[in-house]
Amino acid sequence: MLPLVIYVFIDVIAFSSVIIAVLPFHVMFLGAGPLVVTLYMSTFSFVQFFASPYIGRLSDKFGRKPMLITSCIADLISHSIMAIASSLNLVLLSRVIAGLFSCNISVGSAYISDITSLKDRTKYIGYYNAAFSLGFVIGPIVGGLLAGSDPSNPNYLRANLFAASMNFINLFILFFFLKSSKSLISSQKKTKKFLSEIFSIITNKNVSY
């Protein structure tokens, strides 16, 4: 449970350090007006809205951990693109990539449901949400500090590289410390049992066709 809480804390710091503190100014710096700025800020949520049901199904099929890792890789790619983005199209691409695979809330909550009892579930979801909220407090402050105080020459590269480095740390945490949830293990056992039963039926000489 602790690796998951640390993961979401770091993930939200990375996300909010860019989306809140840096993205609006980055887009304006590239020539966008107020309307375009708001559209770019909402792109992530818009894409996530349509992608979330599919991500949920994939997490049911392949497990929570693989989907969290995939989401983390997508965030790493997204922030790396934003770090070097010199056009609005590249910024848009980065937000679409992040939105397509974002699942820290839905899959993270499902993971908690898989590994906790009904009695303790609300407590651990509370810890998870607290880490999420704390990340949103710290992230924008860090992003603003890294971007600098000069409005004519903000350091977008430094802020986005920080976010990408946070994603890299999260990859390490997910790979080596987060255990697979019991839903995938249960699913694998059911699949093996089903296949063994089919095999026994086929090889059973007493079964008539």
Regions found by a protein language model. Give the residues of each.
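Helix-loop-helix hairpin linking two adjacent transmembrane segments in secondary transporters
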Residues: Y128-F175
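Structural signature of the two symmetry-related core transmembrane helices
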Residues: P66-I81
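Helix-breaking motifs and short loop linkers at transmembrane-helix boundaries and internal kinks
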Residues: G31, G63, I84-N89, F101
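Cytoplasmic helix-loop-helix junction between adjacent transmembrane helices
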Residues: S94-F132
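Hydrophobic core of transmembrane alpha-helices in multi-pass small-molecule transporters
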Residues: F9, S78, N89-C103
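Residue-level signature of mid-helix packing/kink "hotspots" within the transmembrane helices
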Residues: S45-P53, C103, F136-V137
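Juxtamembrane intracellular "pre-TM" segments in multi-pass secondary transporters
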Residues: S180-Y209
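Helix-loop boundary and gating motifs at the non-cytosolic
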Residues: M1-S45, Y209
